Amino acid sequence: MAATTLYNSCLLQPKYGFTTRRLNQSLVNSLTNPTRVSVLWKSRRDVIAKASIEMAESNSISSVVVNSSGPIIVIDNYDSFTYNLCQYMGELGCHFEVYRNDELTVEELKRKKPRGLLISPGPGTPQDSGISLQTVLELGPLVPLFGVCMGLQCIGEAFGGKIVRSPFGVMHGKSSMVHYDEKGEEGLFSGLSNPFLVGRYHSLVIEKDSFPSDELEVTAWTEDGLVMAARHRKYKHIQGVQFHPESIITTEGKTIVRNFIKLVEKKESEKLA
């Protein structure tokens, strides 16, 4: 298993299927025989989510102490768009590391003491996302977490929602106007136009009828009513978007990534206060 440490760097967009090892970056923290994590919440999902969050809260001081020296960790769900997100973070001066979703366990991830987490887009469903679902549940309550496309779907499923085919079909490279409401609070869309233009690359969405409104709140939507962003009601630093902020179609996408980094910095300052 290997990770890639990234600083201010300009990354070329790789073709689909490139791995972190094939980019011109330094490899660090090599570990042998990583344990694969099986995520089991097709049944009793709400019970597992509640138990995982309670465990995360109880361990927040002893085993998952967050400090400013840790990186933002990107969980790559085998998607080339991950590197566009990385490029934005590099341009914004962010120190981060990238791991494929089967390169390390959640326990290994905790030991890295991340400042924040980004769950990338990817093919398939949240059940195909390796450690992403478990990461949302166990680390989401502790550090800022930003899910993009499949990352938002992982947030939705982790907290009890159902991921279904979009009633409007496949949206691949399509543009939409997105409206948002963060209730006057600073969030991912702070400073953006309302509505704003986004690029969409997905066929799945969080089902409207099963949306876990007791746990999550919708913060952005399309004109036809599909959920385009959500955040946790209690842990407002758990946020995700269905569209792609790194797409050239998304006119203010870099601002969204910058707002996530600001959220990480704000959370750190609160811990130090």
Swiss-Prot record:
Span of the transit peptide along the chain: 1-36
Pathway(s) the chain acts in: Amino-acid biosynthesis; L-tryptophan biosynthesis; L-tryptophan from chorismate: step 1/5
Gene Ontology cellular component list: chloroplast
Enzyme class, spelled out: lyase
Catalysed reactions, as listed in the record: chorismate + L-glutamine = anthranilate + pyruvate + L-glutamate + H(+)
PROSITE patterns referenced in this protein's UniProt entry, alphabetically: GATASE_TYPE_1
Keywords, alphabetical: Amino-acid biosynthesis, Aromatic amino acid biosynthesis, Chloroplast, Glutamine amidotransferase, Lyase, Plastid, Transit peptide, Tryptophan biosynthesis
Activity regulation comment: Feedback inhibition by tryptophan.
Residues annotated as the enzyme's active site: C149 (nucleophile), H244, E246
GO MF annotation terms: anthranilate synthase activity
Major location category of this protein: plastid
EC number per UniProt: 4.1.3.27
Gene3D superfamilies: 3.40.50.880
GO biological process: L-tryptophan biosynthetic process
Location in the cell: Plastid, Chloroplast
Domain Glutamine amidotransferase type-1: 71-270
Protein task: Part of a heterotetrameric complex that catalyzes the two-step biosynthesis of anthranilate, an intermediate in the biosynthesis of L-tryptophan. In the first step, the glutamine-binding beta subunit of anthranilate synthase (AS) provides the glutamine amidotransferase activity which generates ammonia as a substrate that, along with chorismate, is used in the second step, catalyzed by the large alpha subunit of AS to produce anthranilate.
Subunit details: Heterotetramer consisting of two non-identical subunits: a beta subunit and a large alpha subunit.
Protein name, UniProt field: Anthranilate synthase beta subunit 2, chloroplastic
Organism: Arabidopsis thaliana (Mouse-ear cress)
UniProt lineage: Eukaryota, Viridiplantae, Streptophyta, Embryophyta, Tracheophyta
